[in-house]
């Protein structure tokens, strides 16, 4: 299955400890299913593909630590930095009101009828998602992805309309 049909579910941020664990930045609402012991993940990194089997996964200080069967030590874990994991959508992931990161990335950002920039990424935090936007001026800004600030996303038109509070775009 190609990554166009799959969803990114996480990304290796760095190694952790000396036993080959890695810190995974999650981009799934189902880490207990996606990162269950015995699951085989499809990883992609700089044109290389990896199939990695989960030996253990645990939360530690708000981060997911994963140990893969194929990764014996820190050196091997370090080599996985930047690896992105992809998987087919789960059957219950047809949320009418939700969006996947890949659907939001590259949307044009519209404010008061004007194209002011492009969504370049989506950050996931404890308080919710934040859109990373490159403004037409070249500046980068962050916009909370909440209905009050982003009231309309039109995937067919490729736009996200924003109504930011005063000063948000001036930062």
UniProtKB/Swiss-Prot annotation:
User: What are the GO MF terms of this UniProt record?
Assistant: ribosome binding
Q: Which domain of life is it from?
A: Bacteria
Cite the PRC barrel domain residue spans from the record: 96-168
What this protein is reported to do is described as: An accessory protein needed during the final step in the assembly of 30S ribosomal subunit, possibly for assembly of the head region. Essential for efficient processing of 16S rRNA. May be needed both before and after RbfA during the maturation of 16S rRNA. It has affinity for free ribosomal 30S subunits but not for 70S ribosomes.
Q: Return the domain comment text from this UniProt entry.
A: The PRC barrel domain binds ribosomal protein uS19.
Q: What is this protein called?
A: Ribosome maturation factor RimM
- The question of whether Glycosyltransferase is a record keyword is answered with no
Relate the assembly described in the record: Binds ribosomal protein uS19.
Q: Does the keyword NADP apply?
A: no
Under the heading PANTHER family, the entry gives:
RIBOSOME MATURATION FACTOR RIMM
Q: What is its main location?
A: cytoplasm
A Pfam family per the record: RimM
The gene is: rimM
Its family remark reads: Belongs to the RimM family.
Q: What SUPFAM superfamilies does this protein map onto?
A: PRC-barrel domain (SSF50346), Translation proteins (SSF50447)
Instruction: From the Swiss-Prot or TrEMBL record, state where the protein is found.
Output: Cytoplasm
Cellular component terms per the entry's GO annotation: cytoplasm; ribosome
Kindly list the biological process annotations in GO that this record carries: ribosomal small subunit biogenesis; rRNA processing
Q: What are the UniProt keywords, alphabetically?
A: Chaperone, Cytoplasm, Ribosome biogenesis, rRNA processing
The residues that cross the membrane are none
Q: Which HAMAP family match?
A: Ribosome_mat_RimM (MF_00014)
Species of origin reads Corynebacterium glutamicum (strain R)
